[in-house]
Amino acid sequence: MLNHYLPVLIFLLVALVVGVAPLLMGSSLGPHRPDSEKLSPYECGFEAFEDARMKFDVRYYLVAILFILFDLEIAFLFPWAVVFDQIGMTGFLAMMLFLAILVVGFIYEWKKGALEWE
């Protein structure tokens, strides 16, 4: 049983070493000379005009969530399209139900004005 998972374990260990080793080497071998210029916030070569922690409009997050939702829909459609001829009418109806639920949700978001930018 362990023989089946040994390549995966080796892959994870190599990935961990490749990811962590440069970080450790940079922090241990790199110069440590902090000064006020290096510790100040950087904004295109100029002094910061205002607080760097500006509040974002909630609509950005809403659009991002909607994008992820419909991107995930496409991720479900690809495997379905590959096995479409093997799953028959039951698979077709299940996917149509899934798409109908997403369309109803999209229409709801549209009617509520979540996609408007004014």
UniProtKB/Swiss-Prot annotation:
Transmembrane residue ranges: 6-26, 64-84, 87-107
One term under GO cellular component: plasma membrane
Record keyword Transmembrane present: yes
Main location: membrane
MF term (GO), any: NADH:ubiquinone reductase (non-electrogenic) activity
Keyword field: Cell inner membrane, Cell membrane, Membrane, NAD, Quinone, Translocase, Transmembrane, Transmembrane helix, Transport, Ubiquinone
A Pfam family per the record: Oxidored_q4
Top-level taxon of origin: Bacteria
Entry annotated with the keyword Magnesium: no
Membrane topology category: Multi-pass membrane protein
Catalysed reaction, written as an equation: a quinone + NADH + 5 H(+)(in) = a quinol + NAD(+) + 4 H(+)(out)
EC number in record: 7.1.1.-
Entry's localization field: Cell inner membrane
Gene3D superfamilies membership: NADH:ubiquinone/plastoquinone oxidoreductase, chain 3
Family: Belongs to the complex I subunit 3 family.
Subunit structure: NDH-1 is composed of 14 different subunits. Subunits NuoA, H, J, K, L, M, N constitute the membrane sector of the complex.
Biological role stated in the UniProt entry: NDH-1 shuttles electrons from NADH, via FMN and iron-sulfur (Fe-S) centers, to quinones in the respiratory chain. The immediate electron acceptor for the enzyme in this species is believed to be ubiquinone. Couples the redox reaction to proton translocation (for every two electrons transferred, four hydrogen ions are translocated across the cytoplasmic membrane), and thus conserves the redox energy in a proton gradient.
Protein name as annotated: NADH-quinone oxidoreductase subunit A
Organism annotation: Acidithiobacillus ferrooxidans (strain ATCC 53993 / BNL-5-31) (Leptospirillum ferrooxidans (ATCC 53993))
Gene it is expressed from: nuoA
